[in-house]
Amino acid sequence: RERGLLREIAAWLAAFPQASAAIDDDCALLEARRERRLVTVDSLIFGRHFDESVSAFDAGRKLVARNLSDIAANGGVPSDAVIALVMSGDVAQGWLKEFYRGMLETCERYNLKLVGGDVASVAGTHFFSASMTISGFAGTHVLRRTGANVGDFICVSGTLGGSIRRKHFAFEPQLALGQLLAEKNLASACMDLTDGLAKDLPALVPAGTHSALDFSAIPLSEDAGGNVKAAFVDGEDYELLWTMAPEKFEQLRALCGNMKITKIGEIVAGTAGAGTDFGGGFEHF
């Protein structure tokens, strides 16, 4: 089945200009540039990240988009991707074709080249796992999770909460905003929101400080139903969360056009924060 499947995959790839994989070669050949590279990897596993209610197209789209969100969090420009599939023999070829279509259309949308991959089989049934590694280019300023200072504003893009009602399969990675924050050196620290504010925000807060949040300012999605707890624990918002010097906020607002940005708090000296009883956000294990 392997050779036949590889022939089918080669045919699917041929329909998309962003897929430049030489499927018979052992390695992808990439042009070298002098810029610094960003590399990220993420996985999508049936039964963990999606189930039968999710279309193959949406699953393929999400695999690419969640990796691109990592590139956005560092302010990078995506370049190349490779994919590794592990699946049981009962995964239908038609389903796999739609998965590839979701991946490839998303690659095309964000000018990402799929340059290689691997396929392996496992015993049993109903098993599917896809891991994608994306590389990109970083400019002079790279957004990192460390660097926030006392007095910095805490900001988010878009709206938060309620992702379980499909947003986590239809989100747009915030590449343009991440690139703007990096290019103009506007953010002191940045990350993408994948596990909810309760778990992700502490990663940006330096030791000896805490976050003072304005709960009324947190931008909630319609699917959150007005419940601010959703922004803290739902996870998979795939928005950007960053800190910045107060004097740079209006500069960013003037530059970001239609992109929605919101100040939700500040970094404050001392460790006696107000806290929440919202729990710890999404846990992977």
Where are the regions that the model predicts?
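Extreme N-terminal cap/leader segments of soluble proteins
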Residues: R1-S55, N74, I83, R101-C107, ...
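Glycine-/charge-enriched secondary-structure boundary and capping motifs
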Residues: E2-G4, E8-A11, S88-V115, S121-F128, ...
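A generic local secondary-structure boundary/capping motif
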Residues: P17-Q18, C27-A28, L104, D118-A123, ...
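Glycine-rich anion/phosphate-binding loops
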Residues: A21, E52-R66, D90-R101
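Short helix-loop capping/hinge motifs at secondary-structure junctions, enriched
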Residues: E35, A138-R144, F249-E250
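Short, acidic (Asp/Glu-rich) active-site segment that either coordinates a divalent metal cofactor
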Residues: L38-V41, H126-F127, H141-L180
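Small-aliphatic-rich amphipathic alpha-helix that forms the alpha element of a beta-alpha
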Residues: F57-D80, R101-R109, A176, L180, ...
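Short beta-strand segments at enzyme active-site cores
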Residues: G75-A84, V115-G117
